[in-house]
């Protein structure tokens, strides 16, 4: 219940533009290396494999709020963990340079999302599989928070998925 209240409070603040973003130039390699190190320890303890590929050069920078970007990454990874149903879960993270943006791809080999549900996963309170929600927890607003943060950064977010194969979440952030 506390998590739901915290997420609703955060969403209300973001939605009414009451969260002051602290935008700064961030070195992509250094920032994501730190994130991967932190995430890797958690995934290792859960017996989930992690592969990380940074295809940007060492000097690539983005303009972002490091704390809010970390929230985005943790939320997406958290969802991947919740819906991994394979004996050996795997998460791949790829960072690519795409012109004026960097593109982040977070791929899992979980149960995937039905094509009918995919257009709605970023909507507030949307839950793709109600029968599994009570077991996995969550409020149904995590991805809508992620979308709002990415859009407030001048980026966009989308996903592709195949049932029983996995999901790839993509987002772009401006340089």
Locations of regions flagged by a protein language model:
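A conserved beta-strand-to-alpha-helix junction within the catalytic ATP-binding
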Residues: 22-37
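Short beta-strand/loop element within the Bergerat-fold HATPase_c
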Residues: 90-100
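Acidic ATP/Mg2+-coordinating residue in the GHKL
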Residues: 108
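Short conserved segment of the HATPase_c
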Residues: 113-127
């Amino acid at each position: 219940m506390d998590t739901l209240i915290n997420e609703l409070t955060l969403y209300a603040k973001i939605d009414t533009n009451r969260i002051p973003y602290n935008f700064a130039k961030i070195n992509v390699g250094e920032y994501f290396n730190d994130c991967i190190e932190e995430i890797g320890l958690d995934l290792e303890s859960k017996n989930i494999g992690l592969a990380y590929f940074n295809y940007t050069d060492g000097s690539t920078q983005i303009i972002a709020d490091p704390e809010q970007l970390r929230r985005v990454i943790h939320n997406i990874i958290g969802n991947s963990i919740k819906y991994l149903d394979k004996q050996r879960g795997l998460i791949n993270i790829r960072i690519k340079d795409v012109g004026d943006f960097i593109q982040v791809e977070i791929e899992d080999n979980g149960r995937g999302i039905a094509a009918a549900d995919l257009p709605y996963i970023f909507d507030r309170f949307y839950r793709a599989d109600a029968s599994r929600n009570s077991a996995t927890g969550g409020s149904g607003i995590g991805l809508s928070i992620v979308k709002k943060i990415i859009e407030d950064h001048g980026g966009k977010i989308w996903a592709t998925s195949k049932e029983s194969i996995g999901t790839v979440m993509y987002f772009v952030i401006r340089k």
